[in-house]
Amino acid sequence: MNIKDQYFDGERPLYESRDLRLERVTIGEGESGLKESRHILAENCRFEGMYVIWECEDVTCRNCYFASSDRAPLWYCRDLRLFDCLIDAPKAFREIDRLTLERIKITDGAEAFWYCRISEISDLQIEQATYAFMHSRDLRVSHLWLAGKYTFQYARNLEIHNAVLDTKDAFWNSEDCTIYDSEIKSEYLGWYSKNLRLVRCRISGTQPLCYAENLVLEDCSFAPDADRAFEKSSIRATILGELPSIVDPLPGSLIENR
């Protein structure tokens, strides 16, 4: 069924929809506009009510807008795909299985991407990303711009390419995460991580990469403020240029300057 140029509000206006195409539709004030729906395509739509896409399956959104009033807009879904969307809503993406994002901007990234699994993301800009990506796993992302704090904590099996990350306390207690060709500004980066691997990255911020297990750095460089690195970490590293200071890495660690 196709629905074009209509406005819906109230509670559950399109609840349990099936095989639905929405074009230039607004879901206004209310809750759970598309809850428990299946096989949905939304194009050039506007979502204003809270909890709009919850417990849904096989949903694609193109050129859509999620307003700040649409709190927690995308939770508990499977096979969710967004392209060319703007999200002003906080707490987007919670417990999503099989998530695809391309060319997305999120202006309030607080608590976004918690417990998301099997994700492919490219060209994502996320602001105010406090605690974003907590407990996410099996994530592949390229061209990420992120500003926030406490991000990627307890994340598992992440691969990130060509990112700019400005985030305090990132990757704490993470496991099996690899970052390529990225700029990372993070005080206390990667504490208590396991199998964190950084390849051709530029790192800034005090006391990076402490208490880390099996830390690997390949051709990385450090800014002058990245002091007191590697305390109590087990590490294999090749460093380009000078490293401001090192504090007591574990015995057996190998650090080579080029």
Write out the residue ranges for each language-model feature.
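Long, distal/terminal scaffolding or interaction modules
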Residues: 1-258
